[in-house]
Every structure is written in structure tokens, then in C-alpha cells.
């Protein structure tokens, strides 16, 4: 390698589903590097053998790619054996094209790590990783529930049962009771009045007309399974939420600080989602800009030959950004927080809604970083600081007259005639 060697003893791992290719690079005082290669199984026994092999060569620095979920058990075993693991995105350790093998990939990762050319990924503590896994699984359950509700809605639409026209929520108490009655007695006409709650604003006559449809046997079977699956998913989601609240109890003080930010005090799970993604220790992000960049809420740098190819935000934070956007969309509609609404309107007028919303997300992330760094509650003063006023500008008489002309003003002398200014800085036509 022609680059400067920063680590004299390190290891590169090429992790696969069944096998792990390892390569240790040992550099002596004369800058000569000797490589040791080995192949290990991804079973627990093979991971323990990997730890023993690393200790044999006194290697405590390991670098590997984040390949799917296969890196997680390897990381856990190495971390328990006091081995420092650097996890990197595959795009930062991409090998040269041609003549590629797994052993050469491990050696390439070792060489990059040896020369300090690997960009490490953010790995939160173990308890935060467990919390993140449950929070993301809850999000998947929510998506599954939404999908099943759409299928149930389609069954009612195909059968010409217009419950969505008379109820705001077809899965509410009254609508669900009517749906169950239809499934128990398909094709029969019944009175809907006993199933409608007294607080329902829709007249009984309209509801009776909305259920004047016929559901087929096939659609009834499908609708029954959809409703049953929705109930099961809701039960699983409630159990996951109980476990999420249990795991987040030790971070209650941090969550209270996050909930002082506008938009995070309505739903207690919103603050937990933020905690599960970024953790409670902000020392891993030197500045608020680093956190914003990690979350994918800032423009990219993609420039070549003085041409800017793209300034779009990155695809990072696929689970984190939707939460921030949801909070930002709620904040811009509130009149209680002018620090957000004023900035949103100013940017929207120039750049549009989408870019303005991402700017509000950046403001929220900046506030989160400062709150968790200083351990102080949110205050809007930081965003409401007055901008520095420009110094007095000096204009010549012709410049001042030209400016007044552009604004459409008419200059009238106190004693002289009236001058109309339209085409030039100095008056020509006087009357």
C-alpha cells in the first residue's frame, strides 16, 4: 500500500451467511506488512474460534461490512470479548472491479482499515439496539394493519356496502357491529338502529340505505379473515408496545427532555422512536450538523468539474425521517410556535413545501442535539434570535431617484412643479 499505515495490527472480515473470511495485517517497524488469513463458520462455535484466533495474534481492531443482518451476531460475540469492531457501509469499502474473491475482499477491507480510509457507522449501545428493533417492528405491524384495513375496505366496496360514506371510521364501534351482523346473516335485511351508537351524527335512514347491498360468500370469507387478522395484529402491537415502554423506563429523564420539544408531547411513543434511532449519548455526533447529515436531512455533495450533479437529500434515516416529517407537518399548522411556522413560510415561498418541511426537520434535529448535549429543556429563544440588521447603505441622488422610480412613486416638490418619473433617474418632463 502506498498510503500511510495508521494501524499496525488490524483485521478485515468478509461476513457471509455461512462463512466468515478473516485477514489480519501485521506491520513491523520497517513498514512491511504480513497477512494472516483464515476461514471460520458463522455458527457460535466458529465465532468463538475467530475470537481465539484474533487473540493469538494480539489483534483487537476489527473492521467488517454491514451485510444485512449477518453482521449482528458477529458484532455481539466480538464485542463481548473486548474487541473493538468498526462497522462500515459497503459503499465505503467497495473493492476494485475484476479479479474478485471473498479472501481478496477481506484483505481489501483490512488494507483500507489499516490506512484509516474506512468511514465507521454509528452503532448504539445494546439496549438501544434492542429498543430500536422493537420500535421498527411496531412500525411494520402498523403497516400490516393498514394493509388489512384496505383489503377489508375493498371487500365492502365490491359488495356495495357504503359504510365509509356514513361513518368516519368503518372500524369503529358502530360500523364494526353492523359488519359483524352482515357476516353472521349474509343477504338478510335487518334494522341497523340497535347497532348504532347514540353519539352517531348520521341519520339512521342513511345508514340503513348504505347497508342495502349483497355480499357474496367469497367476499364474506375474505372480509372475515381480514377482520380476524386485524384483531390479532392489534393484540401483537399492544404487547410490543408494553415491552417498548418497559425497555425505555431507564431513559425516562431523557424522554422527558425530548418531550419538551413541540410536537413530541402528544404521543409518548414519538419520543421513544427518536431515542431508539439516535440514542441518548450525543458525544458520537460532534456537532448538530453531523446528526442532521446522519439522519439524511441535509443536501448531498455531488460535484464534478464545477458541475453540481445532485443536491437531493440522501436515503439515510428511512425509519427516522418519517417521524420527523410527521412532527414537522403538525408544527407548521400550529399558531403557538412561530419559530417553526415563520421559517416554513419563508422557505416555502422560495423552494416549495417539500424542501421547507425538510428544513423544519433540520430545526427539530438541531434542537434535539442541543437538548441532549446540554441536558436542558427546549426553549424557542434560540430560533427567535433577531437577525443582524444590515448597515446603512449610501446611495447617490441618481440611485435614489432610480429606486423611487422602480417603486412607482411620484415626486412632488413643495414649491415647484410636479415631476413624473418613469424612464430615467433624472426628471425630464416637468409640468
Regions found by a protein language model. Give the residues of each.
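Phosphate- and other anionic-substrate recognition elements at nucleic-acid/protein interfaces
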Residues: 1-209
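Phosphate-backbone recognition surface of nucleic-acid-processing proteins
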Residues: 97, 256-260, 272-354
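Short helix-capping/linker segments at secondary-structure and domain boundaries
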Residues: 117-119, 148, 185-188, 237-241, ...
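Short, solvent-exposed helix-loop connector elements
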Residues: 119-136, 163-166, 218-221, 305-313, ...
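Helix-hairpin-helix/helix-loop-helix acidic hairpins
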Residues: 208-269
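Basic, amphipathic alpha-helical segments enriched in Lys/Arg and hydrophobic/aromatic residues
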Residues: 348-403
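Acidic, Ser/Thr-rich low-complexity intrinsically disordered segments
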Residues: 400-421
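Single conserved hydrophobic/aromatic residue that forms the stacking wall/gate
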Residues: 422-431
Amino acid at each position: 500500500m502506498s498510503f500511510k499505515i495508521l494501524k499496525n495490527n488490524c483485521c478485515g472480515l468478509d461476513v457471509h451467511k455461512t462463512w466468515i473470511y478473516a485477514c489480519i495485517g501485521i506491520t513491523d517497524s520497517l513498514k512491511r506488512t504480513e497477512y494472516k488469513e483464515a476461514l471460520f463458520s458463522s455458527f457460535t462455535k466458529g465465532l468463538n474460534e475467530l475470537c481465539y484466533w484474533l487473540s493469538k495474534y494480539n489483534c483487537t481492531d476489527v473492521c467488517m461490512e454491514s451485510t444485512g443482518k449477518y453482521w449482528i451476531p458477529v458484532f455481539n460475540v466480538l464485542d463481548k470479548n473486548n474487541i473493538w469492531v468498526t462497522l462500515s457501509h459497503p459503499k465505503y469499502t467497495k473493492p476494485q472491479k475484476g479479479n474478485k474473491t471473498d479472501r481478496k475482499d477481506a484483505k481489501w477491507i483490512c488494507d483500507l482499515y489499516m490506512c484509516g480510509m474506512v468511514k465507521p457507522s454509528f452503532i448504539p449501545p445494546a439496549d438501544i439496539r434492542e429498543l430500536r428493533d422493537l420500535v421498527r417492528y411496531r412500525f411494520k405491524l402498523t403497516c400490516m394493519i393498514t394493509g388489512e384495513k384496505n383489503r377489508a375496505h375493498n371487500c365492502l366496496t365490491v359488495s356495495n356496502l357504503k359504510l365509509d360514506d356514513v361513518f368516519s371510521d368503518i372500524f369503529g364501534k358502530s360500523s364494526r357491529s353492523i359488519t359483524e351482523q352482515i357476516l353472521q346473516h349474509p343477504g338478510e335485511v335487518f334494522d341497523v338502529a340497535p347497532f348504532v351508537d347514540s353519539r352517531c351524527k348520521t341519520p339512521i335512514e342513511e345508514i340503513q340505505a348504505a347497508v342495502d347491498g349483497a355480499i357474496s360468500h367469497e367476499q364474506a370469507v375474505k372480509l372475515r379473515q381480514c377482520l380476524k387478522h386485524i384483531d390479532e395484529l392489534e393484540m401483537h402491537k399492544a404487547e410490543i408496545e408494553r415491552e417498548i415502554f418497559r425497555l425505555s423506563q431507564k431513559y425516562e429523564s431523557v424522554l422527558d427532555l425530548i418531550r419538551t420539544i413541540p410536537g413530541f408531547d402528544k404521543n409518548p411513543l414519538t419520543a421513544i422512536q427518536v431515542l431508539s434511532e439516535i440514542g441518548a449519548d450525543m458525544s458520537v455526533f460532534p456537532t448538530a450538523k453531523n446528526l442532521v447529515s446522519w439522519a439524511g436531512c441535509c443536501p448531498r455533495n455531488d460535484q464534478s468539474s464545477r458541475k453540481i450533479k445532485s443536491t437531493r437529500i440522501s436515503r439515510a434515516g428511512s425509519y427516522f425521517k418519517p417521524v420527523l416529517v410527521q412532527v414537522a407537518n403538525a408544527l407548521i399548522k400550529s399558531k403557538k410556535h412561530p419559530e417553526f411556522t415563520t421559517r416554513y413560510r419563508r422557505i416555502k415561498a422560495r423552494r416549495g413545501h417539500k424542501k421547507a418541511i425538510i428544513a423544519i426537520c433540520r430545526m427539530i434535529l438541531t434542537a434535539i442535539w442541543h437538548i441532549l448535549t446540554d441536558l436542558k429543556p427546549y426553549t424557542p429563544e434560540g430560533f427567535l434570535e433577531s437577525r443582524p440588521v444590515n448597515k446603512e447603505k449610501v446611495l447617490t441622488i441618481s440611485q435614489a431617484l432610480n429606486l423611487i422610480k422602480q417603486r412607482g412613486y411620484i415626486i412632488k416638490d413643495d414649491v415647484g412643479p410636479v415631476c413624473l418619473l418613469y424612464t430615467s433617474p433624472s426628471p425630464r418632463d416637468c409640468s
